[in-house]
Amino acid sequence: MKKGFVSCLLFMCLGMAGCQQKDVEIRIIPQPQSVETTSGTYRLQKQATFTSNLPETEGKEFAEYVQASPLGLQLSTEESEKAAVQFVIIAPGNEHDSTESYQLEITSKGIVVSAPSGAGLFYGFQTLLQLADADTDGTYTLPLVDIKDAPRFAYRGLHQDVSRHFRTKEFIKKQLDAMARYKLNTLHWHLTDGAGWRLEIKRYPELTEQAAYRPYPNWKAWWKGGRKYCTKDAPGADGGYYTQDDAREIVEYARQRHITVIPEIEMPGHSEEVLAVFPQLSCSGKPYVNSEFCIGNEDTFTFLQNVLLEVMDIFPSEYIHVGGDEANMESWKKCPLCQKRMKAEGLSDVKELQSYLIHRMEKFLNDHNRQLLGWDEILEGGLAPRATVMSWRGEEGGITAARAAHDVIMTPGEFCYLDAYQDDPTSQPEAIGGYLTLEKVYSYNPVPKVLTKQEAAYIKGVQANVWAEYISTPEHMEYMIYPRLLALAEVAWTQPEQKNWEHFRQSALKEVSWLQAHGYHPFDLSKEVGERPQAATRIEHLGLMKPIHYTTPYAPQYTAGGDSALVDGVRGGWTYGDKRWQGFLNTDMDVTI
């Protein structure tokens, strides 16, 4: 009798789980909406089993993903109640529930992840992975919890600029893995720009033959060295491009992780690389002169539509991003074809001429069941009827679009541009400038307070942008992305009332270790210097609050508060972005105190 009892106890320990009394600290990024804990833990054994009631194809993909995870789970063919982990599709609670929601229950009897969709189960599994604390014997200790979770925003994005510096297919996949861990669901892929064309277009092979490589090792050298392109076999050629098969492979890899890839094809500006290859599409008709397409030339529209047809065949995303930013409109003012177009269409200025192009591109995309997405400059000259605005020059563009009943993705540079320095610039690798800390990213609320509840509903999400002018290596790119992307992930997913900076920072420290252990190259948050120490203390000097006379005026965008800035005893932070530095442009500083 005693022997049988011992055997039974041994079976319980080696089978589904063992209940421990040690509590486990719960740290999840992004922070779930609701976490209820019970004292004790659950031990997940080696090669524990799981079941899933997902439909066949989706279920097979999900099972393969789960089995490849560090937990070592094995798909069970037995009844689900006998499995250590059960993944269960359930009916949504009501029509307003997010399809990405999930519930994760860990009890002394096992683990149940339930959700109304495969995406929800996937995100529940990501939470389970973050909770799992590996033991030395290959088992995993898990806290007893009941987590109910759903995203705040439907769009949770990361932008990757691969024009300034090309990234390999493997690098992109690696970032998709990290995005999945932190429940981000959109990769905005900046494939074309003046620094290089990165996508194979079969109708126009010259684009990648003549504009995907540069005779310099990095963007900075190229920018200073004449900004010319070269072929792949030219001496010192640097760059690359994605074949259509490469792009499809990445799209599929992302889809299996519930990530949508949105391609960006720049127009009408940022197109030097196209116009070097096809100068007849520019206003001058000469290579290396213009950055903007000639909107008066009908061949421009033929070219763009042909390109977009191939792009849409590769990318099934609802959105196609057309850029629309930073166009230099001077050439249009002097171009006979552009002026003829303006007269024929009754356009009053060149901003309306750009809007004409955006309107035509939107109709073309809509005719192919796609939606146009563009930077906030597409507001100028009149917004296309169904366009979605990506607000980067602050929030003003997003506010204007939301008030006009247009969908908006918020990505203001002040909070979302990860190419800025993240710590003391003297201790960091080169960046474009600025100073954007983890804490500042975390502080961002994508819904401006000035919007009404009805207007705020048009804010569909938020995105981190990584422009790559000064980021030449993949290691440097990851250093700029992580851990700030984790803060953006929590901004995008977690309701504001559930956010807590100190708790998040401790969680981020843990995740930095995870990222390092898995081959990423994040900024070491444990060594963060923080704000410039001198900026925290008032300086006493003989000129304190004395009268001051400016012989040369300071720039209106760098006032630092006005005339008293130089005598108020307050010093600026690491960069002018804190609005505490007074600046003088195109003139020497001449001041008398």
Question: Positions of the model-derived regions?
Answer:
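Feature activates predominantly on carbohydrate-active enzymes
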Residues: 95-319, 360, 364, 463-467
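Bacterial Sec-dependent N-terminal signal peptides
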Residues: 1-25
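Flexible loop/turn segments at secondary-structure boundaries
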Residues: 58, 166-168, 194-200, 268-274, ...
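Disordered, acidic Ser/Thr/Pro-rich linker "stalks" and the adjacent N-terminal cap
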Residues: 534-593
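Flexible, acidic glycine-rich loops studded with aromatic residues
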Residues: 372-377, 382-387, 393-537
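Contiguous, structured surface segment used for ligand recognition
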Residues: 19-155, 476, 491-523
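Active-site neighborhood of glycoside hydrolase catalytic domains
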Residues: 274, 280-385, 392-399
